[in-house]
């Protein structure tokens, strides 16, 4: 099962039993646990990558990986996963992390808990804003709008009555786009919105 996991800069898990053999990870290697029970035993990960931010801050130091969860898998109502086998598949860039989070919402539009508010990452109804480089802001709604600073990552998900109609993710690399509200049209083209006068 495809899932996501956060780590310290040294690829260690900050939660769990803190033993070297169960807390330090190696890319490509499979780790094994005897049993899995969410919030108790096994290796933990999340199906929604943004849920990892509840445990590891979006600070430019922590690392986020796509993982493969296998073996005995236990899930809880908070979308956490515990498994007896886990393998690090790919380290995600900030853009890939945001993309995977949007993809999760597109694949599971009816699931709750999609709104997120962490330092550096906001996923919100109707409008969201990112301030710094590599910060993430994703807006979801009938007429979503986003705004971000230079080199921030912005996502737009248009929906109506719970059905996803369109989506787009961009990185702000054109200076004139920084700090301006934007949305997408029916052709998924980015449209700058007029700023309201003070």
Residue ranges and their predicted role:
Residues 1-198:
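Short, glycine-biased loop/turn motifs at secondary-structure junctions and
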């Amino acid at each position: 099962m495809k899932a996501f996991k956060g780590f310290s800069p040294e690829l260690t898990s900050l939660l769990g039993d803190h033993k070297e053999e169960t807390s330090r990870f190696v890319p490509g290697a499979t780790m094994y646990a005897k049993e899995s029970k969410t919030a108790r035993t096994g290796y933990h990960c999340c199906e929604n990558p943004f849920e990892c931010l509840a445990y590891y801050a979006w600070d430019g130091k922590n690392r986020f990986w796509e993982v493969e969860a296998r073996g005995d898998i236990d899930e809880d109502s908070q979308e956490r996963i515990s498994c007896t086998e886990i393998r690090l598949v790919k380290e995600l860039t900030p853009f890939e992390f945001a993309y995977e989070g949007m993809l999760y919402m597109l694949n599971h539009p009816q699931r709750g808990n999609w709104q997120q508010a962490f330092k550096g990452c906001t996923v919100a109804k109707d409008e969201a804003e990112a301030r710094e480089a590599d910060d993430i802001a994703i807006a979801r709604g009938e007429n979503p709008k986003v705004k971000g600073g230079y080199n921030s990552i912005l996502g737009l998900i248009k929906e109506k009555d719970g059905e996803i109609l369109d989506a787009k993710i961009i990185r702000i690399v054109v200076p004139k786009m920084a700090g301006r509200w934007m949305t997408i049209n029916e052709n998924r083209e980015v449209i700058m919105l007029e700023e309201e006068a003070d």
